[in-house]
Every structure is written in structure tokens, then in C-alpha cells.
């Protein structure tokens, strides 16, 4: 389907969980002939990342309102009004056929500005519980989409757009068929690392000894400390790295993953077809718990909340999973995945753009 001459503005910023799914949809539509611009903030990751993907970006000034002091709270209406004005000027200049909100602070003023300009707004909620901005914008959006059931009562469940190299991994029954020896445990802390993983897993390695082999991604600045912890535990045979550049290769290597349960991580693990032990980040909305719950309910994962995440608890879970169990869990994870999430979101964007009056001309 050709999108020749159609214009999309993607609103997403702050974290990879918002930006990467937006980029996946943007590239998919650009391949169909769409023009794409981005709306973001100049001091967050999208400012560097989006232009590297060949997409022009416009900036507005906005930041989060949660947990700020009284002066910031009092000035919030003025700052939001100014951000909406900035976004509206950008919308009028670019004249998109449709706007896609993928989350982050920028989506609020951007979505309101689009609505004021009569431009259809499509929202995508990546997490199992809706963020404040998306909850608010859902009342004015043309279409609301969600990655996991439950964020919105009536929204279509379309999954999270996931990287193509992860989607291309062989099915679990092919990948895991002839494996033997120690169970391969991939520990992923993300770019900043996860202290609870870095502190607990060396002890788990000592407890389970030669029954497991670990590849532990520790995050920025934690390499020497965690290497020392494994050494002190008499476990020098494991692979400890600060970052993992090729996550698809790491997933292909692993029999099981131990990690946080950010929205994209959960979606990637399901797409890869991997069993998981999740330790959700302790957030007051319990966002990561709700992200992980569908996989636990499907029998593909186990959740251990951070206060209970101990050497004994983790060792007990991992030692209870033999290769037969892990293969069944991997197949259940793959069954929960929505591999065509990018295409589903792109189709809804196209439909919303098509619903706009065809006589609207670009300036």
C-alpha cells in the first residue's frame, strides 16, 4: 500500500521504550512513501537518536510534572500552554495528515496541538498500565492502541513494535532442540544496569555452581565491581559485560533471561520465545509488574518482586527449571508474542490519515 505524499508526525521522547517503537513504525511507513517528522525535546535521547535514523526533528520545551516543587507545580499551566503553542506552530508549518503519540512528556502538548489543528491523533501505550499523558490524551484521540491488555478497557491490543533481528530468531523448538550441559542464563540490567541483579546473581552463581552458565550485562560503570563479586564467589567462568550491542545474538544464546520488565524488554522476550524470571522495577504505578503479568499467566515466566529477590529465591526458581520445562515455557512465550505489531500500528495510522478530509492540502 502506497503512502505517497502522506505526512506523519511522531511524538515520542525520553526513553528507548517510547522512541524505539516509534522509529520502527516510522521506518515502515517511510518505506511506503510517507514523509515523517518527529516532535521531541532537545535534552533527551531522541535529540541524537532520531536524526541518525534520517528523520528530521522539531523540539518543544516541556518536562515532567510529577514530584516537582510547589513553584514548578504553580508554573505548570503556563509551561504547558507555551509548549502547546510551540507544537501548534510546528503542526501548522508541517501540516501532517496524522500524528502518532508513542508516549513521553512531549506527547501531551503535541497531541493537544494536533487536536486543536484538526489533525487525527493515534495513541500507542507500550505499558500494561497507561501513563498519565496517554490517559489524558485518550479522550481526544481518534484511535487508542495498547501493547498489553488492561491499560485501556476498550483499546485494540496490537503489541509493541520489536526489532526485526529479534523477530527473525528461529522458533524455540529449533533453537533449543539439541542443547545440553549447564543452563544458559542471560542477565540483563539495561543501559544503567540494575543494582539488585548485580548484587544477587554472583551469589546465585555460587549456589548453583556448574548447573548454570551466566552472561551478565551489568550496565554503565559497574563492570569492575560485579566482576569482583563473581571472583569473590569463586565464579570466574562466567561472561560479564558492561553492554550488549547485539541483543538478538544474546537472546539466541540464552535458555532463560533474568531481567527487569520494561515494556520493550517483555515484548522482545516474547518475540524471541524465551522463558524469563522478571524482577519489576519498584514504581508506584507497578508499571513493570503489569507488563510482566501476561507472560507469567501464560506459564512463560515467573515474577519475583524486588523485596523478595534473594539468592535463595532466585536459586530455587532456576534450579526448578529443567530443559523440558524451559522449552515448554519458551513456546508459551512465543505464543503470546504479537510479531506484526509494527504493521498493525502502521495500518491504524494509515486508516486515521485516510479518514481526514481529502481536500486538506499541504502548504
From Swiss-Prot:
CDD domains: GT28_MurG. InterPro entries: GlcNAc_MurG, Glyco_trans_28_C, GlycoTrans_28_N. The keyword Mitochondrion does not apply. Pathway: Cell wall biogenesis; peptidoglycan biosynthesis. It is found in: Cell inner membrane. It comes from Pectobacterium atrosepticum (strain SCRI 1043 / ATCC BAA-672) (Erwinia carotovora subsp. atroseptica). One of its GO terms (biological process) is cell division. Gene3D superfamilies: Glycogen Phosphorylase B (3.40.50.2000). Belongs to the glycosyltransferase 28 family. MurG subfamily. It catalyses: di-trans,octa-cis-undecaprenyl diphospho-N-acetyl-alpha-D-muramoyl-L-alanyl-D-glutamyl-meso-2,6-diaminopimeloyl-D-alanyl-D-alanine + UDP-N-acetyl-alpha-D-glucosamine = di-trans,octa-cis-undecaprenyl diphospho-[N-acetyl-alpha-D-glucosaminyl-(1->4)]-N-acetyl-alpha-D-muramoyl-L-alanyl-D-glutamyl-meso-2,6-diaminopimeloyl-D-alanyl-D-alanine + UDP + H(+). Cell wall formation. Catalyzes the transfer of a GlcNAc subunit on undecaprenyl-pyrophosphoryl-MurNAc-pentapeptide (lipid intermediate I) to form undecaprenyl-pyrophosphoryl-MurNAc-(pentapeptide)GlcNAc (lipid intermediate II). It holds the Pfam family Glyco_tran_28_C. This is UDP-N-acetylglucosamine--N-acetylmuramyl-(pentapeptide) pyrophosphoryl-undecaprenol N-acetylglucosamine transferase. Keywords: Cell cycle, Cell division, Cell inner membrane, Cell membrane, Cell shape, Cell wall biogenesis/degradation, Glycosyltransferase, Membrane, Peptidoglycan synthesis, Transferase. The gene is murG.
